[in-house]
A protein has these predicted regions:
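Chymotrypsin/trypsin-fold serine protease catalytic domain
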Residues: 24, 29, 37, 111-121, ...
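Protease-domain processing segments flanking chymotrypsin-fold serine proteases, especially trypsin-like
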Residues: 10-89, 98-105, 109-111, 122, ...
Length: 339
């Protein structure tokens, strides 16, 4: 898949009204004959799959809720996050032709992980000028634990300019988006604008402030093409929560990766998710007492640490501004490249 630059004229209209019933319409997934077998998944060695710029291989057992989005023709085109047993959150621009997902895999090329067919999918209404998110409902529940969305006290205590996030995905590993590996990648990035209030030219005004945030790493470390829809995890004393969904590169990025990424804040779309799915999503439990002075204390050094209420549960969880916006969508090059 070629690098995708999307230029759109952004209207000043706001996002879909969550009180009016304007939630969009679910679309059925592809027909049954398009479903991949385990043997077909194991045969994906021809692909040019992908990873994060400046990252490292995810260890087995970490970030099992990170999903590779599979399309017709055995193609992986985006990344996502399992937020309920049968619900994956990803980018709105990743919704065309979804076949299913692979979760609980750190190397898609070896056929490992759990393949689950999609039942239906939906993009946020007018995602290109509001929230660039989409949902995939699965045919059956995943066996790995879903990730809780950062909300309420977790955001109050840990989401600020300078906070550290973990970015995980199946995107390119070089700034030009030409080199790929089979292994799931992760890295650490710094939040530079936690509510998209200081970089107005990079953010979509209709959902700012509070609908998006910006993060970047040192020495060009960043998400890249193929990480679209993937998770940004906020690491806290209370566990690791998904706080963002990869949308696009900043204006400084041009056609390269490494200058920062704009994320949709996951908490901003919780009402939409709950209305469409009928679920009451899990919420973090707020601890007593003030937050740590530096936002973190005594976190495990191991990547992908996942603790809820102080209990390590890794054993059951393998874990645009106004006018014309040159929005660099971080689409993942495919298992097989589309003609």
């Amino acid at each position: 898949m070629m690098v995708a630059l999307l230029t759109v004229a952004l209207a000043h209209a706001g996002p879909a009204d969550l009180t009016s019933g304007d939630f969009g319409t679910w679309e059925d997934a592809l027909d049954a004959e398009d479903v991949l077998t385990p043997e077909e998944l194991a045969a994906l060695e021809e692909r040019g799959a992908s990873a994060i710029v400046g990252g490292w291989d995810v260890a087995a057992g970490d970030w099992g809720d990170t999903a590779g989005i599979v399309y017709r023709g055995m193609e992986v085109g985006c990344t996502g996050t399992l937020i309920a047993p049968d619900l994956v959150l990803t980018a709105g621009h990743c919704m065309d032709g979804v076949l299913g997902v692979v979760v609980d895999s750190v190397d898609i090329g070896d056929g490992s992980g759990e393949w689950i067919r999609a039942r239906r999918s939906i993009a946020y209404p007018r995602w290109w000028r509001s929230y660039d998110v989409g949902l995939i409902q699965l045919e059956s529940p995943a066996s790995v634990a879903p990730r809780t969305i950062a909300q309420d006290c977790i955001l109050d205590r840990y989401m600020y300019d300078g906070a550290e996030i973990a970015a995980v995905g199946y995107g390119a590993i070089d700034e030009r988006g030409t080199r790929y590996v089979d292994e799931l990648q992760e890295t650490r990035l710094e939040v530079t604008d936690h509510d998209c209030s200081t970089r107005d030219d990079d953010c979509i005004r209709s959902v700012a402030p509070g609908g998006e945030f910006i993060a970047r790493g040192e020495d060009g470390t960043d998400t890249c093409f193929g990480d679209s829809g993937g998770p940004a995890y906020l690491m806290t004393d209370e566990g690791d929560f998904v706080v963002g969904v990869v949308s696009r590169g900043t204006r400084d990025s041009g056609a390269r990766c490494g200058a920062g990424t704009i994320y949709v804040r996951a908490d901003a779309v919780v009402p939409w998710i709950e209305e469409l799915s009928g679920y009451d999503l899990a919420r973090p439990e707020c601890p007593d007492g003030p937050p740590p002075e530096d936002g973190l204390s005594d976190l495990d050094d191991a990547p992908g640490n996942m603790r809820i209420n102080g209990e390590d549960i890794r054993g059951c969880s393998t874990a645009g501004g106004p006018g014309a916006l040159g929005a660099l969508l971080l689409l993942l090059p495919l298992f097989r490249r589309r003609d």
